[in-house]
Amino acid sequence: MLVPKRVKYRRVHRGKMRGEAKGGKTVAFGDYGLQTLESHWISNRQIEAARVAMNRYMKRGGKVWIKIFPHKSYTEKGVGVRMGNGKGTPAGWVAPVKRNKIMFEVAGVPEEVAREALRLAGTKLPVKTKIVKREEVGGESDEG
């Protein structure tokens, strides 16, 4: 699973999820991408589940790029613990993803296989998603 090697601070503020993604809105590496239509926190377990679903369907053919990383920790208080007494202990890692961000990219497989693999990955995530082609999102084309 994806986790940071080390972080400066174990506990971080939640922050805001306003607006859309500043970068990462184009299909840069692959031919097809999975674009989010909502802003949300995506956990490292959800990213891993989506990756496994894609790789299983593609039968280890093609290449997958994961363009998000869970660098933000979230905390939880224990069950039955009263309010106050500081922030809880870190419970896991999330990737804050804003709308229109390309989360996964796929290349090296036929279009039907790529679309189905990305659809399966989308079912593992807590956001509405859309499958996009390189040309549809303003990615660089091969024609010169």
Swiss-Prot record:
Transmembrane segments: none annotated. CDD domains: Ribosomal_L16_L10e. GO terms for biological process: translation. The keyword Chloroplast does not apply. PROSITE patterns: RIBOSOMAL_L16_1 (PS00586), RIBOSOMAL_L16_2 (PS00701). Keywords: Ribonucleoprotein, Ribosomal protein, RNA-binding, rRNA-binding, tRNA-binding. HAMAP family: Ribosomal_uL16 (MF_01342). NCBIfam families: rplP_bact (TIGR01164). This is Large ribosomal subunit protein uL16.
